[in-house]
Amino acid sequence: MAIQPLRLDPITVLGKQLVIELFDCVDQRFDDIQWIEESMLEAARQANATIITSAFHKFSPIGISGVVVIAESHLAIHTWPEYGYAAVDVFTCGDVLDGAQAVRVLSERLGSRRHLISSMDRGLGGHRLGLLSRSLAGNGPVDEDSPTLRWALGQGTGVA
C-alpha cells in the first residue's frame, strides 16, 4: 500500500504566535536580568500559563535574552537597552493562554511608549500573518478590544 501525502486545507493550525516589538522602553531596570526574568514570569502567570522553567542570559556589555517554557509553549525576549527596544514572542498551542494580558504586562513593566504586535497562526501547511495592534506614533496602550487582536487570540471574527 502506497503512503498517501497528508492533504491540508489550507492550514491545520497547531499554535498561535504573537510577535511583539516594544519601542522606547524607559524603565531603568531594562538591563537587570533578575527584573527581566521576573517580568517575563509575571507575564506568564497573568496570562494563565503553566510555567515549566525559565532560562536567561546577560550579554556583555548590555542586553538580555531569555525564555520562559510553559506547558502551552513559550515566551521569549531579547533586549537592546541601548536602543530602548525589546523583541518578544508569545507562542501558545492551546486556548487557555491570554496573550493580550502577557503583552500588557510586559509593555507596562518595560515602560514601552510604542509597540507593534503581529500574529501568526502556525502549523501544518504553512502559516497566516496579521497585524494586531500598533502604537507607533507614541504612548498608546495595547488595544485589547481591537477586533483584529480578538480574532488573533481566537476571541472574535476580526471584523469591526
UniProtKB/Swiss-Prot annotation:
Substrates-to-products reaction catalysed: S-adenosyl-L-methionine + H(+) = S-adenosyl 3-(methylsulfanyl)propylamine + CO2
Sites annotated Cleavage (non-hydrolytic): E72, S73
Domain of life: Bacteria
Keyword Iron-sulfur: no
Assigned keywords, A-Z: Autocatalytic cleavage, Decarboxylase, Lyase, Polyamine biosynthesis, Pyruvate, S-adenosyl-L-methionine, Schiff base, Spermidine biosynthesis, Zymogen
GO cellular component: cytosol
Uppermost EC category: lyase
EC number annotated for this UniProt entry: 4.1.1.50
Post-translational modification note: Is synthesized initially as an inactive proenzyme. Formation of the active enzyme involves a self-maturation process in which the active site pyruvoyl group is generated from an internal serine residue via an autocatalytic post-translational modification. Two non-identical subunits are generated from the proenzyme in this reaction, and the pyruvate is formed at the N-terminus of the alpha chain, which is derived from the carboxyl end of the proenzyme.
SUPFAM superfamilies registered for this protein in UniProt: S-adenosylmethionine decarboxylase
Cofactor: how bound: Binds 1 pyruvoyl group covalently per subunit.
Any one Pfam family match given in the protein's UniProt record, by short name: AdoMet_dc
Single GO term (MF): adenosylmethionine decarboxylase activity
List of catalytic residues: S73, H78, C93
Cofactor: pyruvate
GO biological process terms on file: spermidine biosynthetic process
Pathway: Amine and polyamine biosynthesis; S-adenosylmethioninamine biosynthesis; S-adenosylmethioninamine from S-adenosyl-L-methionine: step 1/1
Subunit-level organization: Heterotetramer of two alpha and two beta chains arranged as a dimer of alpha/beta heterodimers.
Family statement drawn from the similarity comment of this UniProt entry: Belongs to the prokaryotic AdoMetDC family. Type 1 subfamily.
Name of protein: S-adenosylmethionine decarboxylase proenzyme
